[in-house]
């Protein structure tokens, strides 16, 4: 599966807050890390962090945890 920046992908990691949601690939790291694909979502998650309104709207995933949407 060849995923590239800007592609719409569906999340297939069952424990993820965004499971079965669709997001946009923001970047792909090629250095060999475990979760190289950064995906950006429209909605934020439930973790509010200091300095942001509401929560986080990006997360890292392995390519095997994604499918084209």
From Swiss-Prot:
Subcellular location field: Cellular thylakoid membrane
Entries under Gene3D superfamilies matching the protein: 2.30.30.50
Pfam families: PSI_PsaE (PF02427)
GO CC aspect terms: photosystem I reaction center; plasma membrane-derived thylakoid membrane
InterPro entries documented for this protein: Elect_transpt_acc-like_dom_sf, PSI_PsaE
Superkingdom of the source species: Bacteria
Membrane-protein topology: Peripheral membrane protein
Keyword check for tRNA processing: no
Gene Ontology BP term (one): photosynthesis
Coiled-coil residue spans: none
Family: Belongs to the PsaE family.
NCBIfam families associated with the record: PRK02749.1 (NF002745)
Known role: Stabilizes the interaction between PsaC and the PSI core, assists the docking of the ferredoxin to PSI and interacts with ferredoxin-NADP oxidoreductase.
Protein name as annotated: Photosystem I reaction center subunit IV
Organism: Synechococcus sp. (strain CC9311)
């Amino acid at each position: 599966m060849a995923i590239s920046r800007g592609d719409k992908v569906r999340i297939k990691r069952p424990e993820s807050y965004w499971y079965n949601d669709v997001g946009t690939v923001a970047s792909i790291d090629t250095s060999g890390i475990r979760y190289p694909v950064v995906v950006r979502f429209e909605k934020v998650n439930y973790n509010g962090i200091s300095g942001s309104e509401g929560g986080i709207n990006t997360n890292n995933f392995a390519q095997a945890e994604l499918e084209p949407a």
